[in-house]
């Protein structure tokens, strides 16, 4: 008998698939779109952690293929943006060259996975034929008022020398390079994602996504209900508007805090406080929002000016503190220290009065040592509101405040508009022309794409200007409206621009007339299953939903959610759970493992290593067990393929149990237990073969079909050995007959007074009377008393109660 030679078998079937593709659209099958989050082509290539997501998506795609679907399973490259440019700078090569080399390397590595990617659909975000449509979307957003320019302090990475969106700042540091983030005043292009806040929030309910991701997006959007209240500034003709979710506590507002960037902040300083106020404003400008919100000791400065509480006329000192952000609410808050931990801490530190306005059972706390933050209680020290329940007043106060003319009921969001420009070279040029007469004018659609000019010096300037600003011949142009001299926008788009819509382009990637034809969009979109890491929960996944809703609104597609189902795979880590990285020296390359054990063994171990949604620690020794299983199954099939064994009832039962167990685990995405299930049933079949003298061909064929999505090369090889003339992937996924799974005989326990005294085998459909009689017969020598009760729990126990 031939030995299992993984190298020869895998080479043979790779070549066969090249000549005879297995996933062909005949126009009759139902489509199934399974998508990976496309990679950005880093210089380090793929390690075994990257393989995991690609293997999961390929196994799922092949399963859909066997279910009779036409599977859309494309791949492409997220190649613009900071990661690619930073790598190019580090290596001292132009990003266009380094990106092309990295794409070629990773494409070779992806080929080793043996995934059924349709490379005819391939896209690359740096291809002008692709980013023509990235720019086209921006132009449409500009025309609809969703893209606008604004100068304001943004997150600034001193190392990457570019602005960052809030989502790109992690623990006060740049997500990409880890440098502490500061603030810089810059002219920026913004996308008005806030216009879609309610739809982005409400439509989460219709998505089959992990609850964790939906919760993260819900919290990021951060919708809250409350009131805006106007506090007059004492001695001035000015008012400060605050946003509060607790207008019921207005009588307890003993001070007010403004963000250091608030437009009135500097002007509120008195002669005595001006120096301290200006220093505080400057110091705050050097901190990132994340730093400012961290749970550490609060800082602040008194402006020397007071506001008037509009409800009771009390003087309220106005402070500045960096824990208030200019871009949340109104950039000013009223502070009720008796009922907010942060305000309480601030008031204690700066000796500000604390007035309790909510009390349990209406009883005031003497000498408060902490804030009373219970959600409900009775109002005290609140004038006409005394005696009301705070939970009721919280809902009624916004309307009451509105009627008094001191504020209005309002809704607020934590979600901010998206900072969409980057001061870098390697990105899509923003298709806007600045004309002194006409203002901002979009590049005419028939002139798209506006291509990125080739330059010698692409390094970031650090001045707040993109390297494109230094290219006079490119910057200087004519206005498409008036024909006068004008200048091009020199900032580029962020790396998220292309990835926010790329999944739409795959199905019509060669179309030079439309982003995607409506015919193909209706036929092949949206995505049925999206697979990738949870780290994209509030970046890419939120942006993609925003883009899709916009494209739905302008009639490009007829759906407003891009991804029906989402699966987030866990990370593969090195020893002790440490993330794999070149710098840590713990990267495991798949190349050697493929050589030594084969692609099929590595694919299966990637899934066997642990539940796919959880992080798992890599251990090379584990692949040996999977490799042994493949050899044993190969030998089992070859040992039995030529035997003329008739199907027995036991074989039939085992076959249908195999189908049931594998499919149930598969559909639960419990892929690690699918692999262990294969191993269990291989052992059962081996034992049955010894007992029966062999295994029937239908059972062997069934096992091969079930295994094929996981070990496609071996699946094809054994399918041919069993007489298959076409690809195993043109077979049909087996169906399970639950009747055939049923046992003829079952084991039940026989108890006396609730204690097990024996076990008997009885027919599965035995009657109560027969079961009790059989049970009594089995323990008759132990029945010494008077029987007072006989109990039969079907298929489980017989219990004889005696005195």
Language-model segments: what does each one mean?
Residues 3, 11-12, 16-20, 90-240, ...:
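Residue patterns forming the tRNA-binding/recognition surfaces of aminoacyl-tRNA synthetases
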Residues 305-311, 315-328, 357, 477-612:
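Alpha-helical recognition segments enriched in aromatics with Gly/Pro capping
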């Amino acid at each position: 008998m031939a030995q299992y030679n993984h190298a020869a078998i895998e080479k043979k079937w790779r070549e066969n698939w090249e000549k005879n593709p297995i996933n062909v659209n005949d126009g009759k099958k139902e489509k199934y779109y399974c998508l990976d989050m496309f990679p950005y082509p880093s210089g380090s290539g793929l390690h075994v952690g990257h393989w995991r997501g690609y293997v999961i998506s390929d196994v799922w795609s092949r399963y859909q293929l066997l279910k009779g679907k036409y599977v859309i399973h494309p791949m492409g490259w997220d190649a613009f943006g900071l990661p690619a440019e930073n790598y190019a700078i580090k290596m001292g090569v132009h990003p266009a060259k380094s990106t092309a080399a990295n794409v070629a390397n990773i494409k070779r590595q992806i080929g080793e996975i043996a995934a059924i990617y349709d490379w005819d659909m391939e896209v690359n975000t740096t291809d002008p034929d692709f980013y023509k449509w990235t720019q086209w979307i921006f132009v449409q957003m500009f025309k609809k008022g969703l893209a606008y320019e604004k100068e304001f302090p943004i997150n600034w990475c001193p190392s990457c020398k570019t602005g960052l969106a809030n989502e790109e700042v992690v623990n006060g540091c740049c997500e990409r390079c880890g440098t502490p983030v500061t603030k810089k005043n810059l002219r920026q292009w913004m996308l008005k994602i806030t216009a879609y806040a309610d739809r982005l929030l409400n439509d989460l309910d219709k998505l089959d996504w992990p609850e964790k991701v939906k919760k993260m997006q819900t919290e990021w959007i951060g919708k809250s209900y409350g009131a805006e209240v106007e506090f007059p500034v004492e001695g001035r003709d000015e008012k400060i508007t605050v946003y509060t979710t607790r207008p019921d506590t207005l009588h307890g507002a003993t001070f007010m805090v403004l963000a250091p960037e608030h437009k009135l902040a500097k002007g509120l300083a008195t002669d005595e406080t001006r120096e301290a106020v200006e220093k505080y404003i400057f110091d705050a400008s050097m901190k990132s929002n994340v730093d400012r919100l961290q749970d550490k000791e609060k800082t602040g400065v008194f402006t020397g000016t007071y506001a008037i509480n509009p409800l009771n006329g009390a003087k309220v000192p106005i402070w500045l503190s960096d824990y208030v952000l200019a871009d949340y609410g109104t950039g000013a808050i009223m502070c009720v220290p008796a009922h907010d931990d942060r305000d309480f801490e601030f008031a204690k530190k700066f000796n500000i009065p604390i007035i309790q306005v909510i009390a349990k059972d209406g009883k005031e706390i003497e000498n408060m040592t902490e804030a009373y933050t219970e959600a409900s209680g009775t109002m005290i020290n609140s004038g006409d509101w005394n005696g009301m329940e705070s939970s009721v007043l919280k809902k009624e106060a916004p309307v009451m405040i509105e009627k008094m003319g001191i504020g209005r009921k309002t809704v607020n969001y934590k979600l901010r508009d998206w900072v969409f420009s980057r001061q870098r070279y390697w990105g899509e040029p923003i298709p806007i022309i600045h004309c002194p007469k006409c203002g901002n004018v979009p590049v005419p659609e028939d002139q798209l794409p506006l291509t990125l000019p080739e330059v010698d010096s692409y390094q970031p300037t650090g001045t707040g200007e993109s390297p494109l600003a230094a290219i006079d011949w490119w910057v200087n142009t004519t206005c498409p409206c008036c024909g006068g001299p004008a200048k091009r926008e020199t900032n580029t788009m962020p790396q998220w621009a292309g990835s926010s819509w790329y999944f739409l382009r795959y199905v019509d990637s060669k179309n030079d007339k439309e982003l995607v034809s409506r015919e193909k969009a209706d036929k092949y979109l949206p995505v049925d299953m999206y697979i990738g890491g949870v780290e994209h929960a509030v970046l890419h996944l939120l942006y993609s939903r925003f883009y899709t809703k916009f494209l739905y609104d302008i009639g490009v597609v007829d759906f407003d959610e891009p991804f029906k189902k989402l699966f987030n795979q866990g990370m593969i880590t090195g020893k002790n759970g440490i993330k794999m990285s070149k710098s840590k020296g713990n990267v495991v390359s798949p190349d050697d493992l493929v050589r030594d054990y084969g692609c099929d063994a590595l694919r299966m171990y990637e899934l066997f290593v642990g539940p796919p949604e959880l992080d798992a620690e890599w251990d090379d020794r584990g692949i040996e067990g999977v490799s042994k299983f493949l050899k044993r199954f190969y030998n089992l099939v070859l040992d039995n393929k030529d035997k003329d064994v008739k199907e027995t009832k036991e074989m039939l039962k085992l076959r249908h149990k195999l189908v049931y167990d594998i499919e149930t685990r598969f559909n639960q995405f419990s892929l690690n237990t699918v692999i262990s299930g294969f191993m269990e049933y291989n052992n059962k079949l081996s034992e049955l073969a010894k007992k029966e003298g062999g295994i029937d061909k239908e059972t062997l064929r069934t096992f091969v079909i079930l295994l094929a999505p996981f070990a496609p090369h071996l699946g094809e090889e054994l399918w041919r050995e069993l007489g298959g003339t076409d690809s195993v992937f043109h077979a049909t996924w087996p169906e399970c007959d639950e009747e055939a799974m049923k046992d003829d005989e079952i084991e039940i326990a026989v108890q006396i007074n609730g204690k097990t005294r024996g076990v008997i085998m009885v027919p599965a459909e035995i009657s109560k009377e027969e079961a009790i009689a059989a049970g009594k017969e089995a323990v008759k020598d132990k029945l010494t008393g008077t029987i007072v009760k006989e109990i039969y729990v079907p298929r489980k126990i017989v219990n004889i109660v005696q005195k």
